[in-house]
Amino acid sequence: MPWIQVKLNATSENAELISDMLVEETGALSVTFLDAKDTPIFEPLPGETRLWGETDIVALYDAETDMDLVITQLKASAVLDDNFAYKIEQLEDKDWEREWMDNFHPMKFGERLWICPSWREIPEPDAINVMLDPGLAFGTGTHATTALCLEWLESIDLTGKTVIDFGCGSGILAIAAIKLGAAKVVGIDIDPQAITASKDNATRNGVAEQLTLFLPQDQPENLVADVVVANILAAPLRELSSIITAHVKPGGALAMSGVLDTQANNVASYYSDNFTLDAIAEQQEWCRISGIKK
């Protein structure tokens, strides 16, 4: 059915108050926060909900809603200024599931690696194909950090190697490593949902026997590999640098992403004593740090 959308501008200080008011007083069915100024926010503290300095609030209503009454209620609210700006838009009825699926296409990384959603035809059946559908909020190859790691894995010889995917998420990097020739891969993640997602995706790709998955507290001691890839964030890459370094065999390779260009040199400094680092690779505002352990 069709919907009515109302967009308001807010600040980080009053956005949640406005959201509560839209739901409780005007009957909004959903409320979404959007960045009004294209300003990234990363690494909130545990339990913290960060919002942008200028935040757009988008509220969704049933098409039968009396929007004149909604606007009257908004104007009477103490949360909003008297002269607040708003935009009302009628949303056409669509097959939203089909619309969502249409946005995902097979993606190629390097010369031979493809990530393909299950509902799409495989472009190159003889290439290395990882079947992976979006879900569970974990990587599917669309983000620059995942792409940087996939391109790196595709560029090195993994034949017969052992690999650790540190922060495995969906398992996309671990599965790609196996399909690229790795003999055995270990995936580690703090989130039990990630372990479940990785296991399911590995089974779907026929590589479950080569993938072992651990929560950090369950992993064996002295776990090392020829290749380690860690697509997480700058803060844990700094805080866990000694642990990540210890996972790499002497002469082994390490690649890390989840790092902004403004953070890359600082993160690299935590590894430069133990690794001969490559030039930092960049895609959009994201970076990959890689090197060989001394």
Swiss-Prot record:
Top-level taxonomic group: Bacteria
Annotated Gene3D superfamilies: Vaccinia Virus protein VP39
BP terms from Gene Ontology: methylation
Residue ranges of the TM segments: none
GO molecular function, one term: protein-lysine N-methyltransferase activity
Binding site for S-adenosyl-L-methionine: 146, 167, 189, 231
Pfam families per record: PrmA (PF06325)
Subcellular location: Cytoplasm
Gene Ontology cellular component terms for the protein in this record: cytosol
UniProt-listed PANTHER family: ELECTRON TRANSFER FLAVOPROTEIN BETA SUBUNIT LYSINE METHYLTRANSFERASE
Family: Belongs to the methyltransferase superfamily. PrmA family.
Protein name: Ribosomal protein L11 methyltransferase
Source organism of the structure: Aliivibrio salmonicida (strain LFI1238)
Classification lineage: Bacteria, Pseudomonadati, Pseudomonadota, Gammaproteobacteria, Vibrionales
